[in-house]
Amino acid sequence: MNWLTNVVRPKIRNILRRETPENLWIKCPDSGHLVFYKDVEANQFVIPGSNYHMRMGAAARLKSIFDNETWYDIALPEVTPDPLKFRDERKYVDRIKDARAKTGMNDAIKVGYGKLEGGAVVVAVQDFDFMGGSLGMAAGEAIVRGIELAVEKQSPFILFAASGGARMQEGILSLMQMPRTTVGVQMLRDAKLPYIVVLTNPTTGGVTASYAMLGDVQIAEPGALIGFAGARVIEQTIREKLPEGFQRAEYLKEHGMIDMVVHRHDLKATLARLCRLLTKAPMPEVIVESEPEPEPEPVVAEIIPPTSDLPVSAPAPAPVAAQTPAPAAPSA
């Protein structure tokens, strides 16, 4: 029994652990139901049934927006990784290394250039998995570089915001990115190019005090948390209970803070339509295929077979020739 307990059973457990992925199932934060990860991934990270919008990585977001799931990654300028030599519980450089290993990104923002329903666009995406999508020098440089490319290509600039605010490990250098990105937005306005912002869950802090709320059109995903300070901080400051749904996308739309709340499945079509309207681009031709006319049904002659019950008509009599009388004999 000792051999079975100490040797065989642990080996079986190790085999089962290796064969079962850690992210095989996802628990829906809204309904609490377990959902198969592959189903969520195939549904653009929207929980089937509850329609809860999960966080979406930068690469998956770009893949869902661009035509044929292809785009050009824009090379971003290098910045000093740790200008203040900051350290709290861990070194700032160690946190950056962990975030890069987790996401495969150099920093919190990824910029791509490609086609959106045939029209050229520049898209910048913040990834919340990279240190909470915080705004630092590298993220600020990425936004400015994306705006400069949009001005160069004369194309709309679309930004997906997802952030907890400015990156505290960079101090005033992080806060400086707020006015820098605001100046970048002004560059788009001077060039008369559309700037569309999609607010995702969550978008808070200094990001909402700068570029995230300066779009020509403000779109939000359903249920997204959007605000500057947290709800608990506001309640403690004003000493009042906040209304239900405060700082959620639907609440902000009802109070005029954003323009529309769009389901993730409809985002691509909505963004393409807005870009065409704001740039006065021609609408794509819609070819309506007319249904072919139905072929006429063949007419089949109905033949009634003769039956013995039908009366048989007698043959018609032959015509009789009219007889002329013989002439009378002449008298003597």
Curated annotation (Swiss-Prot):
Record's subcellular location: Cytoplasm
Bias-annotated ranges (Low complexity): 298-332
Keyword Lipid metabolism carried by entry: yes
Pfam families according to UniProt: Carboxyl_trans (PF01039)
Region (Disordered) residue spans: 288-332
EC number: 2.1.3.15
Keywords: ATP-binding, Cytoplasm, Fatty acid biosynthesis, Fatty acid metabolism, Lipid biosynthesis, Lipid metabolism, Nucleotide-binding, Transferase
InterPro entries the UniProt entry points to: AcCoA_carboxyl_beta, Acetyl_CoA_COase_Trfase_b_su, ClpP/crotonase-like_dom_sf, COA_CT_N
A Gene Ontology molecular function term of the record: carboxyl- or carbamoyltransferase activity
Chain's role: Component of the acetyl coenzyme A carboxylase (ACC) complex. Biotin carboxylase (BC) catalyzes the carboxylation of biotin on its carrier protein (BCCP) and then the CO(2) group is transferred by the transcarboxylase to acetyl-CoA to form malonyl-CoA.
Designated name of the protein: Acetyl-coenzyme A carboxylase carboxyl transferase subunit beta
Origin species: Rhodopseudomonas palustris (strain BisB18)
